Amino acid sequence: SQEHQGNRITFAVFSKRLNKYVGNISITFIEENYRNAEIGCVWYEKSAQRTEVNRESVFLLLKYLFDEMNYIRVQWRCDIENIPSKNAAEKMGFSYEGTFRNYAIFKGKVRHTSFFSIISSEWVEVKNKFENELLRKYKV
């Protein structure tokens, strides 16, 4: 299921293993002219956190953006203190690009934001790793 809000498309995430809705993930900061977007606004309930849910959801969005929409860059960003998000980005093949200091104010606190990306020339290798992992996991 999806909901389109201006410059964001939000998808409901359903876990087949848990047989229920477990969260949301979005494509944000969509720049169609430049064929760039960001994967963000990610939220999962406790039962889905640190499971295959995020990894597989991100893979589906990357596949859509690179293979269907022919995008050339997809980014991921997070607060520098959000170590689980930074680790997830790197494990999924996003490359660290740098940190913007004093990038945002969230809940009254100035935050520094780390940026990661996958570009189109890297996509085939990243995609192959994801697909091989899924084949091993589900023994397809």
What are these regions (language model features)?
Residues 67-77:
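Conserved GNAT acetyl-CoA-binding A-motif
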